């Protein structure tokens, strides 16, 4: 295309098709020869002016699909539940330690026991009964009627039967002019009229744990 036609095309005096086709001639020839399409005019100007050889991009990190691949490099979570190590396991208790003596209010004090129940003491012939239900109230009444101090251990009874037996023993002690005293939780002492048990002696009975062993 002549220079005059270019000027006319620039000022709108001639169609632009011929003007634009000039810049695609090389690409058209390449498309016919090699089978590739024409490129925009701007890319050709940049390549010709600055020696630009095409778009280049920095390769980013490759996509890693899947949940398992995403966390493959991360340290695996160690669960809280784990088998105990040898030094974590408590040493088994010795049988002798499990059979250790009773402490506290139920501990037996042999010396105190001897003083309380030595021969000639009013409590020397004391007996301990551990009824399982209310049907054993008769045995308690017979022992008490014979003049024997009776310790009633009601720990193994349910509360309903224990309450009935307590009411029976209290009425029995009142009828025979004896005394009825609480020694420990669900443990009571029935004393005949001729046996005087002081508060100190009741405390020592509870501390010595006599009712648990006799």
Swiss-Prot record:
Complexes and interactors: Homodimer. Interacts with FtsZ.
Q: For this UniProt record, give its keywords in alphabetical order, as a comma-separated list.
A: Cell cycle, Cell division, Cytoplasm, Septation
Family classification = Belongs to the SepF family.
Keyword Metal-binding recorded: no
- Lineage in the entry? Bacteria, Bacillati, Actinomycetota, Actinomycetes, Mycobacteriales
| Pfam families to which the protein is assigned, alphabetical | SepF
Q: List the coiled-coil residues.
A: none
Species the sequence originates in: Mycolicibacterium smegmatis (strain ATCC 700084 / mc(2)155) (Mycobacterium smegmatis)
Q: What is its main location?
A: cytoplasm
Keyword Thylakoid among record annotations: no
Annotated GO CC locations: cytoplasm
Descriptive protein name: Cell division protein SepF
Function description = Cell division protein that is part of the divisome complex and is recruited early to the Z-ring. Probably stimulates Z-ring formation, perhaps through the cross-linking of FtsZ protofilaments. Its function overlaps with FtsA.
**InterPro entries the record matches:** Cell_div_SepF, Cell_div_SepF/SepF-rel, SepF-like_sf
A single Gene Ontology biological process assigned to it is: FtsZ-dependent cytokinesis
Spans annotated as Disordered: 25-51
- Output the HAMAP family linked to this UniProt entry: SepF
**Compartments (UniProt record):** Cytoplasm
């Amino acid at each position: 295309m002549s220079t005059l036609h270019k000027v006319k095309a620039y000022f709108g005096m001639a169609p632009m098709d011929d003007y634009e086709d000039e810049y695609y001639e090389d690409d058209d020839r390449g498309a016919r020869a090699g089978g590739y399409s024409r490129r925009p005019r701007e890319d050709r100007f940049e390549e010709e002016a600055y020696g630009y050889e095409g778009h280049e991009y920095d390769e980013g990190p490759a996509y890693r699909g899947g949940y398992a691949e995403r966390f493959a490099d991360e340290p695996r979570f160690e669960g809280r539940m784990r088998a105990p190590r040898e030094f974590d396991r408590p040493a088994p208790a010795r049988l002798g330690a499990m059979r250790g003596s009773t402490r506290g209010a139920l501990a037996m004090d042999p010396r105190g026991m001897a003083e309380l129940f030595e021969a000639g003491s009013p409590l020397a012939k004391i007996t301990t009964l551990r009824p399982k239900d209310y049907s054993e109230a008769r045995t308690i009444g017979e022992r008490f009627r014979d003049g024997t101090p009776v310790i009633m251990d009601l720990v193994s009874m349910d509360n309903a039967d224990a309450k009935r037996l307590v009411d029976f023993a209290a009425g029995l002690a009142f009828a025979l002019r004896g005394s009825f005293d609480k020694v420990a939780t669900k443990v009571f002492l029935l004393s005949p009229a001729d046996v005087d048990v002081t508060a100190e002696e009741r405390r020592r009975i509870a501390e010595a744990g006599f009712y648990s062993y006799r």
